[in-house]
């Protein structure tokens, strides 16, 4: 079977080996033909890319990483796309789907697939989380492939061995990774402007050595803030009640003093009248 068919500049995707067209072919396609090509690229894992399930540890690690990064960049107003296991198509390349990807300075809308020729740019960062299966894919083949494709940074969190590794393209136009050397256990990402480090069994992200809060930590913090606010409101309410009681008591004392003064004046007036 021929992997792809091109006839009269029309490119048809082979379902058994789905690939985006080479860049020169893409540039010859009309807008309508390009749209058909994009729609024909699978948004699910083809059999050739299938990987065995890696369980809760794998799922939780990738979801946590995406949520933490998404929350941080949303708060600072930075425009980027973060995806998880999104099928990515480089020109003429077999599809791949890293656990987490980052593409800077693009619209963050939801995507069914990432087609580099259509987007006009490729990935800036890829993160893989290895728990089970073929370690060589993450540790060796991805290092060569991601560098060749021009992905600026690649991080690998080996969850089973509790080891973090990172690679970066060094120099303009170079397509060979150099290892990122950790500083006191922190791996700096130029793409994200953040540091990565393992904390126990978790991959954490840091800004200025301060960890970015995770969802459970944010919930705990918000619950504490709500509790403190409610306690403060209760305290203020109690103080207001006590103040109202004090004002009422003072008002009663004033009224009592005025009554006694009036009685004294009346008595004085009566005594003066009798003295005459």
What are these model-derived regions, one by one?
Residues 152:
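Short acidic/polar active-site loop segments enriched in Thr and Asp
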Residues 2-53, 71, 88-98, 103-125, ...:
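C-terminal interaction segment
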């Amino acid at each position: 079977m021929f992997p792809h068919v091109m006839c009269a500049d029309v490119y048809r995707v082979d379902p058994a080996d789905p690939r985006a067209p080479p860049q020169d072919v893409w540039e010859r396609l009309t807008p309508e033909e390009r749209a058909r090509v994009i729609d024909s690229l699978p948004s699910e894992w083809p059999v050739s890319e299938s990987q065995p399930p890696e369980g809760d540890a794998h799922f939780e690690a990738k979801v946590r990483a995406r949520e933490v990064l998404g929350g941080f960049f949303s708060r600072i107003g930075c425009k980027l796309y973060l995806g998880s296991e999104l099928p990515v198509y480089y020109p003429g390349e077999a599809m791949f789907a890293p656990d987490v990807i980052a593409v800077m300075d693009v619209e963050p809308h939801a995507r069914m697939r990432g087609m580099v020729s259509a987007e006009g740019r490729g990935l800036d960062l890829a993160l893989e989380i290895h728990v089970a299966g073929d370690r060589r894919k993450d540790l060796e083949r991805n290092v060569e492939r991601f560098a060749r494709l021009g992905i600026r940074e690649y991080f690998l969190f080996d969850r089973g061995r509790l080891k973090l590794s990172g690679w970066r393209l060094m120099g303009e136009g170079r397509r060979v990774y150099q290892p990122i050397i950790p500083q006191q256990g922190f791996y700096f990402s130029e793409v994200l402007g953040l540091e990565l480090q393992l904390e126990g069994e978790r991959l954490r992200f840091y800004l200025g050595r301060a960890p970015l809060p995770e969802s459970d930590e944010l919930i705990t913090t918000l619950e504490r803030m709500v509790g403190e606010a409610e306690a403060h409101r209760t305290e203020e309410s109690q103080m207001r009640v006590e103040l109202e009681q004090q004002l009422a008591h003072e008002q009663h004392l004033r009224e009592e003093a005025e009554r006694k003064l009036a009685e004294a004046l009346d008595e004085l007036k009566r005594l003066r009248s009798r003295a005459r």
